[in-house]
Amino acid sequence: MMYQPELETLPREKLRALQEERLKRLVAYVYERVPFYRRLLDEAGVDPKGFRGLEDLPRIPFTKKTDLRDHYPFGLFAVPREEVARVHASSGTTGKPTVVGYTKNDLKVFAEVVARSLAAAGARPGMMLHNAYGYGLFTGGLGLHGGAEALGMTVVPVSGGMTERQVMLIQDFRPEVISCTPSYAQTLAEEFRKRGVSPEELSLEYAVLGAEPWTEAIRKQVDEGLGVKSTNIYGLSEIIGPGVSNECVEERQGSHIWEDHFLPEVVDPDTGEPLPEGKVGVLVFTTLTKEAMPLLRYWTGDLTFLTYEACTCGRTHVRMGPILGRTDDMLIIRGVNVYPTQVEAVLLAIPEVVPHYQIVVRREGTLDEAELKVEVSEPFFREIGQEVLSDEVVEADHRLHALRERIARKIKDNVGVTLKVTLLPPGQAPRSEGGKLRRVLDLRK
């Protein structure tokens, strides 16, 4: 099923023509309404009256997160604050949040693209969605909620946390679809396993997972643990929120970007030059239809690639690959380039832990010191019978001590860097208010 089949299957030449028209209109719109963009375009020598559309797009400088922070809170709004129907904000690692505004029409588009995404993931009108994304300033909860209602679903707005209650509601209400972070889906699967509830006893059929990077190994764990087909939903609050793209349940080989609203590019992280199809680079978006806070060439920092290969689902919109990392997530520790995904691959091969972790880097004098905080699995935690996992407890328990040493050794062998390993009880890895795992904390900056 498709939510908007005519738009989702638009022939590429018609889709490109629509993008051309909307891009030209957007450049004129922000030039007139947003002083920041007027200065940016003037300095780049881009005149909206002579702007030729897609071929001129690379002439426009990138918009970066620092630009949003420099104009906090409402300096990039293109409409009077009174015309803004809703404000969301993403929690930054430091300082003020990144604020995004939405007009009533922006919220309508938001609901439509999420409805498209849910339908691509297998959801249908009349199904029930157990929405375990956080509600509030974080876009996840309200974003999925609005899209599900637009699709005609029944929404259970359970939000994040309270795992025991979530387990009860899933068993009692019997929803067909769940939306949450991949790590929380793993938590729920483990909780059902602990209670002796098999996947076959659950009503769940589809899981819509996002808000943090995940791997095919995690997908396999979730699919088997909950008895679902899980798809990736991608988005970021600066662009609109969740629903910028979603995998189709037919292939699950890349997420369809809704290109009539979000114009994607992949560029070289060092030079900023556009890269051809299939090459990995930084994902950049231009919002073609946003009214309250449109963005030109927004640098997401996410590393991925694009493919225009035809999809068996029939959708014509370009697909993006998985997020392979972030330009700001790569850590250089004592001269070694370290990506969180490398560490995660090691952890996935160790059954006593789960890939819920944080890498913390500090500077001690002139040297970098790195710590890996990682959760042990529920079964292992029960087996060792400890209430806390302090350094003293780990040193005294030969199983914990051996596990800590094994993790450190495998990371040294596979990643090439020595990390101090700290074992955490289940559920104790640092998370943001929206429930997202915070994989990297670089305290050297």
UniProtKB/Swiss-Prot annotation:
The keyword ATP-binding applies. Keywords: ATP-binding, Ligase, Nucleotide-binding. Pathway: Aromatic compound metabolism; phenylacetate degradation. Its EC number is 6.2.1.30. It catalyses: 2-phenylacetate + ATP + CoA = phenylacetyl-CoA + AMP + diphosphate. The keyword Lyase does not apply. Disulfide bonds: none annotated. One of its GO terms (molecular function) is ATP binding. Optimum temperature is 75 degrees Celsius. The enzyme is heat stable. It comes from the Bacteria. GO terms for biological process: phenylacetate catabolic process. Belongs to the phenylacetyl-CoA ligase family. Monomer. Catalyzes the activation of phenylacetic acid (PA) to phenylacetyl-CoA (PA-CoA). Involved in the phenylalanine metabolism. This is Phenylacetate-coenzyme A ligase. The lineage of its organism: Bacteria, Thermotogati, Deinococcota, Deinococci, Thermales.
